[in-house]
Amino acid sequence: MGRRPCCSKEGLNRGAWSAREDKVLKDYINTHGEGKWRDLPRRAGLKRCGKSCRLRWLNYLRPDIKRGNISYDEEELIIRLHKLLGNRWSLIAGRLPGRTDNEIKNYWNTYLSKKVNSQTHQHEIDGDQVPLKKTKEEEVSEKPQVIRTKAVRCTKAYMLTTHLDDNSLITNKCPEPISTERSYSPSATFLDIPMDFDMDEFLAGFECDRNFDQVCDGENPLRLDDKMEEEWRESYECLQLNVDSDIRALSSALLDSEDDWKQNGGKDELMGGGNGGPSSVS
C-alpha cells in the first residue's frame, strides 16, 4: 500500500492562479489557519490540488514574505549555507527570515551558482600564476653563497681536559712501551754510540709514569674504579719493566764500550812507549 493521493487530479485547474483564487485562499487561511492541505480545496471551494494551495500560500501569499531585492549580505549567507548544507533549500530558507525555499533555489540556479563558479575559476588561475612569479623573482634575487675556507696551522699541542662526574670512567690508556730503534750489544764500542743523544726526548715518553703517580697519590681529582685502576697498574708495571730493561741494556753497553776503549787505549800507550825506547837507550 502506498500513500494515497491528495486529490483525484480530475477536473482541477492547472497553471497560473487568478486573483479571485488568491483572495479565496487567503481569506480561508486567515479564518481557519494553516494545515490540513488535503481537505482545504474542498472546504474553501477551490478547484485546485492541496499541494498547489500549500505552495501558493507559502511562496506568494504569506504576509511576511520578502520578494526580490536580495541584499549582498543575504547572498553571502546563501553561499556559505550552500557550502555547508548543499541543495537543502528548505533548511537554507529557514535561516533567512522572509525568504522562501523556492525563491532561494531559483536565485541560486539563475545567478549565484554562476558567480561562485567564476570566482572559483579565477582563484585557481591566480593560484597557478602567483607561484610562478615568485619562483622567477627568487631565482633572480638568489645569489650563490661562496664559503671560503681559512687554512690554520697548529704550532702547539693542546691537551683537552674533560670534567667527569663521580660515576664516570676514564677511558684514556697509557701509551705503548717505548721501543728503542737501536739495539745495544756488549760488542758495541763507545764510538758507535750517537753523540747527539737527547736525554729530554728520551724521557718525554715517561710522562705517563708521572701522571699515573699523580692519579695514584690522589693529586688528580678524577676517580677510577677498581677494574680501571688494576689495568693501569698492570700497564704501568709492564712499562716500568721495559724501561728498566732498556736502561740496563744502555748502561751495560756504555760500560762495555768504556772497558774496550780503556783496553785499546792502554795498548796504544804501551806501543807508543816502546817506539821511543831505543832513542833513550842510545
Curated annotation (Swiss-Prot):
The gene is MYB2. The lineage of its organism: Eukaryota, Viridiplantae, Streptophyta, Embryophyta, Tracheophyta. Residues 271-282 have a biased composition (Gly residues). It is found in: Nucleus. This is Transcription factor MYB1. GO terms for biological process: flavonoid biosynthetic process. Keywords: Activator, DNA-binding, Flavonoid biosynthesis, Nucleus, Repeat, Transcription, Transcription regulation. Residues 9-61, 62-116 form the HTH myb-type domain. Residues 258-282 are annotated as: Disordered. GO terms for cellular component: nucleus. Pfam families: Myb_DNA-binding (PF00249). Residues 260-270 have a biased composition (Basic and acidic residues). It comes from Crocosmia x crocosmiiflora (Montbretia). The keyword Metal-binding does not apply. SUPFAM superfamilies: Homeodomain-like.
